[in-house]
């Protein structure tokens, strides 16, 4: 019933590459904007239109590694015609909600990169939840699958936030997103993930001990990802990387 192994491995590149321990000290060069950057970014956001992607273009021009939202915005606008009426409204209102949220909080967080990046992700997730992303995805699975494509700058935290929000949806919607991701991977990687997807779920997943959100839906764990993938015991190759057994008594 659970088909999590392929989905988890499809998303590992998204989350594992950018997650940072908040307690990790940041160097002055990477932790803060240059002397003129805070006012430039804030002025750009305050002068940007409340519709469209102009506000997110301001984030691409920062020196705090906040790229990603602009590309997500353009993907939504490019695919808006494929959504139904509810979906079109969601595209318009979600982009406006995120842009307004970021603009209203920019002065509180912009001087420290980690705070600024986290604020953008939180606003993004709040707007998706408020405007019922899952309901839109359920009625527009193909259109949403096209929007949730691997971005040119990969990985990035805002693309991951979009995927994590979609993972709280029903199983059919999650499968649609997963299939769309795999279809856009390089052929070799796509084959690898398809093969790994056919493996049985780890005992912990089968026993229902994996991370479960409200209403029984699966949710991507926010801590460091851990994977326990085992091949079929009868066909185990003792020399294979994945065939190494965990020592229990020796």
Swiss-Prot record:
**Which region ranges are annotated with the description Disordered?**
228-250
Keywords tagged on the record: Disulfide bond, Glycoprotein, Hormone, Signal
Tell me the disulfide pairings in this chain. Answer: 44-58, 53-73, 64-113, 97-127, 134-169
The reply to whether Disulfide bond figures as a keyword in the UniProt entry is yes
Q: Where is the signal peptide?
A: 1-17
Q: Which GO annotations describe the biological process of this protein?
A: intracellular calcium ion homeostasis
The record's annotation in InterPro entries points to:
Stanniocalcin
> Which segments are removed on maturation as propeptide?
18-32
Q: What does this protein do?
A: Its primary function is the prevention of hypercalcemia. Upon release into the circulation, it lowers calcium transport by the gills, thereby reducing its rate of influx from the environment into the extracellular compartment. STC also stimulates phosphate reabsorption by renal proximal tubules. The consequence of this action is increased levels of plasma phosphate, which combines with excess calcium and promotes its disposal into bone and scales.
**How does the record describe its quaternary structure?**
Homodimer; disulfide-linked.
Matching PANTHER family: STANNIOCALCIN
Q: Which family does it belong to?
A: Belongs to the stanniocalcin family.
**The name this protein goes by in its record:** Stanniocalcin
Species name: Anguilla australis (Australian eel)
Q: From which lineage does this chain's organism come?
A: Eukaryota, Metazoa, Chordata, Craniata, Vertebrata
């Amino acid at each position: 019933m659970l088909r999590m192994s392929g989905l988890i491995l499809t998303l590992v590149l998204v989350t594992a590459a950018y997650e940072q321990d908040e307690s990790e000290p940041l160097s002055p060069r990477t932790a803060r904007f240059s002397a003129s950057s805070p006012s430039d970014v804030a002025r750009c956001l305050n002068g940007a239109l409340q519709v469209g992607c102009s506000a997110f273009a301001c984030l691409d021009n920062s020196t705090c590694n906040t790229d990603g939202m602009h590309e997500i915005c353009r993907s939504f606008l490019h695919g808006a015609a494929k959504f139904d009426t509810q979906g079109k409204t969601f595209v318009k209102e979600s982009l406006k909600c995120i842009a307004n949220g970021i603009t209203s909080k920019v002065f509180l967080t912009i001087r420290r990169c980690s705070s600024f990046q986290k604020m953008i992700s939180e606003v993004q997730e709040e707007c998706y939840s408020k405007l019922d992303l899952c309901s839109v995805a359920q009625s527009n699975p193909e259109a949403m699958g096209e929007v949730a494509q691997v971005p040119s700058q990969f990985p990035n935290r805002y693309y991951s936030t979009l995927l994590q929000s979609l993972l709280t949806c029903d199983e059919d919607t999650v499968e649609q997103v997963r299939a769309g991701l795999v279809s856009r991977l390089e052929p070799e990687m796509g084959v690898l993930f398809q093969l790994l997807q056919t493996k049985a779920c780890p005992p912990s997943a089968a026993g229902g001990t994996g991370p479960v959100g409200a209403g029984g839906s699966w949710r991507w764990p926010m801590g460091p990802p851990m994977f326990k993938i085992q091949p079929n015991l009868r066909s185990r190759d003792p020399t294979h990387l994945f065939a190494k057994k965990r020592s229990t008594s020796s």
